[in-house]
Amino acid sequence: MPSIPSIEFSLLEKGDAETVNFLQNYLNDVGFFVIKNHPLPKSTINDVFDYSKELFDLALEHKLKYKVPNCNGAVGYTPYGIETAMNETVADQKEFWHQGSNSNPDLLPNVYPDEMNDPYKIDDLFLQFEDIAKSVLACFKSFNINYNADLSDIANNGNSTLRLIHYPQTESNNEHRARAHSDVNLITLLVGGNESGLEAQNRNGEWVDCSCNENEIICNVGDMLEIVSNGQLKSTIHRVVSKGNSDRSRYSIPFFLHPRPEVILDPRTNLTADDFLTQRLKDINLK
């Protein structure tokens, strides 16, 4: 199975012609790449993985205290078997926790579980992920994207989300922990899962392995960025499968960079980020 390319974070920050050419070549094929030597401390990642495991080990009645009503899963806990990929009838085999931005008072406030020690530690990871994602977005400005706003600005005070995911042991007749889907947002960053299984589909319809080591971050383009770039940057279908490890839980920590809700993604139709997200939440059974 083919794999995805990798690039140094320092080159993304530099954003020179060679880096842009490298990214354009690969993003047109698979839309995923690995970021090496990023500034996110390994200790921070390990702390949040440990926190995530402790959180999902809580009894269900405790976790359900943090299922926020009428928020469409924007913050807090979402139970196993709720989110369903577009055009699918079988729900993904996962439960998750959403942490949003604290910088925009117009967004829903985060919730913090009383049962956990230092529940605010994930706010620190959120901010560090956000900085890295904005650096990637700034690099994409060099793609000569025809967009009527500053690409670097649209995510400031945006509706971004840090997601802690737990994929329990899978059912023997269902190898898909997360069925094939694309991400709704601008850019997704993902620290490597504790088990393999993430695959992306290239332009030839082949599934490409998207594993990386624990010191690297996987980055992919989301649907909103494809719209903003008028198709220059391609959002990619991907999935999570159980590769012979269905008897073990899998934990994952993706960060989804979103624009502000009022940002217009497509000036031809005046489609806003909020409109697009609202429709997607309906499509995946979260609204």
Protein language model annotation of sequence segments:
Residues M1-K287:
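Peripheral, non-catalytic segments flanking oxidoreductase cores
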